[in-house]
A protein has these predicted regions:
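C-terminal motif of bacterial Sec signal peptides marking the signal peptidase cleavage site
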Residues: 15-18
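Bacterial N-terminal signal peptides that target proteins for export
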Residues: 1-7
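Ubiquitin-like/PB1-type beta-grasp interaction modules and other compact soluble beta-rich domains
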Residues: 20-183
Length: 183
């Protein structure tokens, strides 16, 4: 192989692999992320269990918004929940509203990291699943610095995760309008 062929091969490889700086763009290799089908295993991976039918000592709701730039990412229905299988992990969803339910027979601290572990989607200080770029986190309308995994799921809390391209200014969306049954 001559030098010109090597140069062309290297140029093609760089073009195909994307020679932008790491994290320079948001990737779309994941959303929409499906709900897990193995409810028991996913719950156990998050330190949760099936509490279907148990008397509840704690019942709170947190709203989760995920944005890829300005595009909403749907939080699936029935993460950690199935009426047919009579399964309800302490943290679960019922629909695609973004409302995350915490229903537990004991009062304890549950976190956003546990919810993402149960969902099977990676969450860290610089990414949500396959979305990479700049992660901005708001909790109840206030900017939060640090690892979003540690955010506690408390009643009527609003968590917003926005992944943008480097240098793009993230925008806090309007607050979630809680349905009246949650007041």
């Amino acid at each position: 192989m001559n030098l010109r062929s090597v140069a062309v091969a290297v140029a093609a490889l760089l073009l195909l692999s994307g020679c932008a700086a790491p994290g320079a763009v948001t990737t779309r290799d994941a959303p929409p992320w499906p709900r897990p089908t193995d409810l028991t295993a996913r719950a156990e991976s998050a330190g949760l269990r099936n509490v279907w039918g148990e008397r509840l000592a704690e019942h709170v709701h947190t709203h989760l918004t995920i944005l890829d730039g300005d595009e909403p990412v749907t939080v699936p229905a029935n993460i950690g929940h199935s009426d047919d299988r009579k399964f309800a992990a302490e943290i679960h969803t019922h629909n695609t509203s973004g409302i995350v339910h915490v229903e537990s027979p004991t009062e304890q601290t549950f976190t956003l990291g546990q919810f993402f572990d149960e969902w099977g989607v990676s969450l860290g200080p610089e990414h949500v699943g396959g979305l990479r770029g700049e992660l901005t986190v708001w909790v109840d309308g206030h900017r939060r610095i640090g690892n979003p995994r540690s955010i506690e799921l408390t009643d009527l809390r609003q968590v917003v995760l926005v992944v943008t391209t480097v240098g793009e200014v993230p925008h806090l969306p309007a607050p979630f309008d809680w349905p009246p049954q949650y007041d």
